[in-house]
């Protein structure tokens, strides 16, 4: 396995084949990170993109995803509430907008927006956000129909978020209340109605590096434009509460391989970045070019500023708005 040759092939515009991707498990980590950074610079430039989310509906989810605090199947003591009113959403939205965050997403627990009044509520919220902010608006509402996705697009949503979470092979070990194809079909429906798609997964569910690579190729085949990388934070009360954390080198290796497989995407550092400990900068110099900043109804201005300082130190130029 010749890493230099693989890197040059990718820089020349050729795809990394899955067999070579599997072999990268044994590549020297520093060289792998350098290759990923070079590929990111070639295909994405030095621009960095931030997004923020708000959990507009919490708890009582019918699905049994083993990592999730919001599943009704587990006793996690998570907060439970229905769709928040716009008046509770706008303060966080304004903080993010003023801080220069590019993207803002409403996220709701549950398999999908199956109550008609929930759909109408979020549509009205999006219309108001569109008129009051400069955000690229995103939505994350689970498994929904093409008709609902079209309605969301009409209300101002530009990107739909729906993770694959892991590989097709490993998925049944994580969730049994819906299928991998349910998720893929939702992504295809979003693309069909003209939405961009943000889809990634969680590292540290018990999967292998091969599973992560398989997921990356699923995402590549779907042609998603943004790929969030979450690192499991075990939640007390879930079946994964005692999961052993991934070592930092394993996380960094996985991120770098994702970049080599997916040269053009926003590779987005998302939940659980604290698992990287003191190596966040290494991840930023190893393939990452976007991130989630802030948190639900917290003062996000300082967080966004500290994150912007961090990416500037890594040589990125922060840009509030640019094409996918």
UniProtKB/Swiss-Prot annotation:
Q: What region holds the Radical SAM core domain?
A: 43-273
Q: Do you know which SMART domains this protein is assigned to?
A: BATS, Elp3
Please indicate if the UniProt record lists S-adenosyl-L-methionine as a keyword: yes
What GO biological process terms does the UniProt entry carry, in alphabetical order? biotin biosynthetic process
> Which positions in this protein are listed as binding [2Fe-2S] cluster?
105, 138, 198, 268
Pathway(s) of this molecule? Cofactor biosynthesis; biotin biosynthesis; biotin from 7,8-diaminononanoate: step 2/2
A molecular function GO annotation: biotin synthase activity
E.C. no: 2.8.1.6
Q: Which residues bind [4Fe-4S] cluster?
A: 61, 65, 68
One Pfam match, given by its short name, reads Radical_SAM
What is the free-text note on the cofactor? Binds 1 [4Fe-4S] cluster. The cluster is coordinated with 3 cysteines and an exchangeable S-adenosyl-L-methionine.
Taxonomically, the superkingdom here is Bacteria
Catalytic activity, as annotated: (4R,5S)-dethiobiotin + (sulfur carrier)-SH + 2 reduced [2Fe-2S]-[ferredoxin] + 2 S-adenosyl-L-methionine = (sulfur carrier)-H + biotin + 2 5'-deoxyadenosine + 2 L-methionine + 2 oxidized [2Fe-2S]-[ferredoxin]
Per UniProt, which keywords does this protein have?
A: 2Fe-2S, 4Fe-4S, Biotin biosynthesis, Iron, Iron-sulfur, Metal-binding, S-adenosyl-L-methionine, Transferase
Q: Which cofactor does it need?
A: [4Fe-4S] cluster; [2Fe-2S] cluster
Instruction: Tell me, in a sentence or two, what this protein's role is.
Output: Catalyzes the conversion of dethiobiotin (DTB) to biotin by the insertion of a sulfur atom into dethiobiotin via a radical-based mechanism.
Subunit structure, as described in the record = Homodimer.
Q: Which family does it belong to?
A: Belongs to the radical SAM superfamily. Biotin synthase family.
Protein's name according to its UniProt entry: Biotin synthase
This protein's species is: Campylobacter hominis (strain ATCC BAA-381 / DSM 21671 / CCUG 45161 / LMG 19568 / NCTC 13146 / CH001A)
User: What's the encoding gene here?
Assistant: bioB
